[in-house]
Design a protein with these regions (language model features):
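Histidine/acidic-residue-rich catalytic or RNA/ligand-binding cores of hydrolases
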Residues: 57, 87-94, 129-141, 152-167, ...
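Active-site microenvironment of metallo-dependent hydrolases
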Residues: 157-173, 177-234
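Divalent metal-binding pocket/active-site signature
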Residues: 47-105, 124
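Hydrophobic faces of well-ordered beta-strands that scaffold small-molecule active sites
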Residues: 6-10, 43-47, 78-80, 100-102, ...
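Divalent metal-coordination and catalytic microenvironments
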Residues: 6, 45, 113, 149, ...
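Glycine-enriched alpha-helix->loop->beta-strand junction motifs that scaffold or abut catalytic
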Residues: 41-42, 73, 92-100, 114-120, ...
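Short acidic/histidine-rich active-site segments
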Residues: 102-103, 121-127, 141-160, 202
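Divalent-metal coordination cores built from histidine and acidic residues
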Residues: 1-75
Length: 234
């Protein structure tokens, strides 16, 4: 009964390394992925990590599943993990339908991803001034969103999670309104969660109230229109 919605991605890289390198507790093959696709709370294919292998081989379990998606579920959300891929290799990766990436990149790598239609997910280590400046100067807000990845419990407790990333982006020069936009609206659209991400008639009443929009420290939090948090000194 926790006041939070949890969605899942289909594990696409289990095991994440070659069986010749390490043993694994199990294998999620194409059949298992098809089964998971039927689950109500599954909204995407989780990050595909064997990016070098997948653009060279077509008999992998995940490659079979991607072909199935292209035939039976075109447009399904497929998340990638492709640090350093550029040019033709990046095109091969995108050709498989993998059009999201959250890993760390140089500015040139960011440009190529956005120019080729990939949704770029910005985590803490990608809050580089030159990257944020490029996005702002070219008004590329629709093509990116703020995310977190592998947040440890102590970091979550001490710094927060997405609120910390948004705050840091603002302090690095990202416009306040667009920082909030890229943490709410664009991620919702990316995951096809069209019932949220904006305050509008007919949408879920999930929102927070801030005393100062430039200080991402929630004073009040509402879930489905019900207040679930209030600062003690608020």
């Amino acid at each position: 009964n926790a006041p939070i919605d949890i969605f899942y991605g289909i594990p696409s890289s289990v095991p994440s390394t070659d069986e010749r390198l390490e043993t694994t507790g199990g294998i999620i093959d194409c059949g298992a992925m098809k089964h998971l696709l039927k689950e109500e709370d599954v909204v995407c294919v989780g990050e595909i990590m064997n990016y070098r292998q997948i653009i060279q081989e077509n008999d992998l379990e995940i490659t079979k599943f991607l072909r199935y998606l292209q035939e039976e579920h075109p447009g399904y959300v497929i998340e990638g993990h492709c640090p350093s891929l550029l040019d033709l290799d990046l095109a091969r990766f995108l050709y498989l339908g993998i059009d999201g990436d959250h890993t760390e990149h140089t500015l040139e790598e960011v440009k190529q991803r956005i120019e080729n239609g990939m949704f770029f997910e910005i985590q803490d280590k990608m809050l580089k001034p030159e990257v944020l400046e490029y996005i702002c100067e070219n008004r590329l807000y629709e093509y990116c969103g703020f995310v977190t990845d592998d947040t440890m419990a102590d970091v979550l407790y001490e710094k927060g999670q997405l609120n910390y990333v948004v705050q840091k982006a603002i302090e690095t020069g990202f416009p306040v309104e667009m920082a909030i936009y890229c943490a709410t609206y664009t991620p919702s659209r990316r995951m096809h969660l069209y019932d949220r991400g904006t305050i509008a008639p007919g949408k879920l009443a999930d929102f927070l109230l801030l005393k100062d929009p430039a200080v991402i420290r929630p004073d009040y939090v509402y879930k489905n229109g019900v207040q679930i948090f209030a600062q003690k000194n608020g």
